[in-house]
């Protein structure tokens, strides 16, 4: 959610900090600020609102900075309303900090500090940490930080400055991600690589419970006992162009158009000898044969990808699969055992609820497989097995290509599970893989012809509410389509299993209400068409997403969206593209900030 940056080097740092913060805008925020060493003091500038209208405008009225070290922050309000006073950095002149996460025991800390004579100005939990650092300060910043974080409960990452230690910045974390970037004669801290990729591709992952002491010459890592930790340098595999729009109006549109390539990068390395291969992570056929239950856990779009996985695994492997929302999984006392497999899906690898679900599964002894996009992320490190989707950075808050490759992984897993359990033979598995390998070209056809999606979007922009319906795999897909639309167009939408309409929801249908029907499954087509007729009779405006060979009465469908033919089982990978583009163009026609929808954050690192 919030974004942290920091710099120490030879260059004037204000512009670097602000530029790095702009790279973290996709994470979501409501205020921003920086703190830098100026002379013998720490200078802080912060403002409510977006960077351009808030912090950057405020900095234009400030005297020229000469500082070469500082920290910065974009805040997503959790404790205290969005305001200048609640913005970060927060400190008292001697200490300044930026903070991502939630301090669960901040009230207790605050009461203690008030008893010691400290006053509080903001409504934030962050201020309790800043004042506790000041209270514990003994001249040694590492000792001070270790004593302080030992008393903090919750998930957090911190960037810290001490007035008496110029040209040094410090970092610490528990759960919430933070990296330390290594440049030439300069060092950085950041919530993720996107913030610093313009300056360096080399970085260290800060481990939970570790403290980093950073100067222009390098970094020293300490554990909670002040022992020095040796860290391996990581190298980002993508370049700065991947984090730029490249001529597209929005990152979301760019990322939708990148999906054919993202699919190839995810699918091709996992095929060996024409068969899906999971040997790199240790997921053997013997394991797949012996798992008693398979659980798939995720949030939002990741959970929807898991729903596709459930349908496909059950259909091919005849193995029961449970799909759970991560925030529910850990609290419902799941019936897990050591012979169960829990598949954890997360784009960032830092989603707090999903990480907590993973830790629960590990604690019970179940096998865990993480499907993530970010190498070295918390979920990747915590899981017993991990597979990377290799989709490249996804900047838009609204997930598109990450969902696509997560769903593709579900197919690869389903094929291997079915083969390992002798539900399909080798020839059948090879045929499925062959057809899956053709999906990128079919997705490309959907991406190339966007006029039909724009036409549909122009009819949706005035809607107050709409429904998505489908059956089987189409229902799983309708859930994702509905989420995309509501996320960025702010139009209320719900997805329903088409057969459930008559059990109550059909009472909502009135003249002109849009209903988007996903109907790609030939064996369910007639049933879905009967539901389409039901809503059409009651005045609905019907958009139908279907394969190009499907026949229908023009009186029943107002706006058909025709798709390239593929095996029914694989159609979710094709049909999701029109749903993404319909949502995109609806929001764009309404002149909304497509990449940064209100109240949403890209990486939800708090529970």
PLM segments and residue spans:
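Structural beta-sheet core signal
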Residues: 4, 36, 160, 171, ...
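Glycine-rich phosphate-binding loops that contact phosphosugars or nucleotide phosphates
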Residues: 289-431, 435-438, 518-562, 590
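Generic C-terminus detector
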Residues: 556, 566-607
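Conserved short alpha-helical segments that host acidic/polar catalytic motifs at enzyme active sites
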Residues: 1-245, 249, 261-268, 272-292, ...
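Extended hydrophobic-aromatic, low-complexity segments
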Residues: 181, 305-306, 322-323, 352-355, ...
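Glycine-rich oxoanion-binding loops at beta->alpha junctions
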Residues: 68-85, 272-285, 309-345, 351, ...
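Active-site phosphate/pyrophosphate-binding segments
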Residues: 259-263, 267-295, 385-514, 587-607
């Amino acid at each position: 959610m919030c974004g942290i940056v920091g710099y120490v080097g030879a260059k004037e740092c204000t512009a670097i900090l602000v530029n790095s913060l702009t790279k973290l805008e996709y994470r979501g925020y409501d205020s921003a600020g920086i703190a830098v060493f100026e002379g013998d003091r720490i200078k802080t500038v912060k403002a409510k609102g977006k960077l351009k209208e808030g912090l950057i405008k405020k900095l234009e009225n400030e005297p020229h900075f000469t500082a070469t070290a500082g920290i910065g922050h974009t805040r997503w309000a959790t404790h205290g309303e969005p305001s200048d006073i609640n913005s970060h950095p927060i400190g008292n002149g001697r200490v300044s900090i930026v903070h991502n996460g939630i301090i669960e025991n901040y009230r207790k800390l605050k009461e203690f500090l008030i008893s010691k004579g400290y006053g509080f100005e903001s409504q934030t939990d962050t201020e309790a940490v800043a004042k506790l650092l000041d209270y514990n300060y003994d001249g040694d910043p590492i000792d001070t930080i270790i004593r302080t974080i030992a008393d903090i409960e919750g998930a957090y990452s911190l960037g810290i400055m001490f007035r008496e230690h110029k040209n040094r910045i410090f970092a610490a974390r528990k759960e919430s991600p933070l990296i330390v970037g290594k440049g030439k004669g300069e060092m950085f801290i950041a919530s993720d690589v996107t913030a610093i990729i313009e300056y360096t591709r080399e970085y260290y992952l800060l481990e939970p419970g570790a403290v980093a002491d950073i100067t222009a010459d390098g970094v020293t890592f300490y554990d909670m006992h002040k022992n020095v930790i040796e860290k391996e340098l990581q190298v980002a595999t993508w370049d700065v162009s991947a984090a730029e729009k490249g001529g597209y109006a929005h990152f979301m549109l760019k990322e939708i158009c990148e999906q054919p390539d993202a699919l190839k990068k995810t699918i091709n390395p996992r095929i060996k000898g024409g068969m899906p291969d999971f040997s790199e992570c240790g997921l053997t056929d013997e394991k797949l044969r012996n798992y008693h239950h398979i659980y798939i856990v995720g949030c939002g779009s990741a959970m929807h990808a898991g729903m596709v996985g459930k349908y496909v695994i059950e259909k091919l492997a005849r193995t029961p699969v449970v799909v759970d929302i991560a925030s529910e999984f850990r609290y419902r006392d799941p019936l897990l055992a050591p012979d169960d497999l829990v598949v954890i899906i997360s784009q960032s690898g830092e989603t707090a609820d999903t990480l907590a679900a993973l830790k629960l599964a590990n604690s019970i002894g179940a096998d865990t497989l993480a499907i993530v996009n970010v190498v070295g992320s918390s979920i990747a490190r915590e899981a017993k097995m991990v597979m990377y989707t290799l989709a490249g950075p996804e900047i838009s808050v609204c997930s598109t290509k990450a969902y696509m490759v997560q769903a593709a992984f579900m197919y690869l897993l389903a094929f291997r599970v079915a083969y390992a359990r002798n539900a399909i033979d080798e020839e059948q598995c090879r045929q499925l893989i062959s057809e899956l390998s053709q999906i990128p070209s079919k997705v490309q056809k959907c991406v190339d012809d966007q006029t039909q999606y724009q036409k549909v979007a122009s009819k949706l922009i005035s809607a107050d509410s709409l429904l998505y319906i489908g059956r089987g795999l189409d229902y799983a897909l309708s859930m994702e389509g509905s989420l995309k639309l509501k996320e960025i167009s702010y139009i209320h939408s719900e997805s329903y299993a088409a057969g459930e309409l008559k059990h109550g929801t059909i009472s909502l249908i009135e003249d002109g209400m849009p209903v988007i029907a996903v109907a790609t499954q030939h064996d369910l087509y007639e049933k879905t068409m009967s539901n389409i007729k039901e809503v059409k009779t009651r005045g609905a405006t019907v958009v139908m997403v279907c394969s190009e060979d499907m026949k229908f009465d023009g009186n029943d469908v107002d706006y058909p969206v025709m798709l390239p033919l593929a095996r029914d089982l694989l159609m979710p990978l094709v049909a999701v593209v029109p749903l993404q583009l319909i949502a995109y163009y609806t929001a764009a026609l309404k002149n909304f900030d497509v990449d940064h929808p209100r109240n949403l954050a890209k990486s939800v690192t708090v529970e």
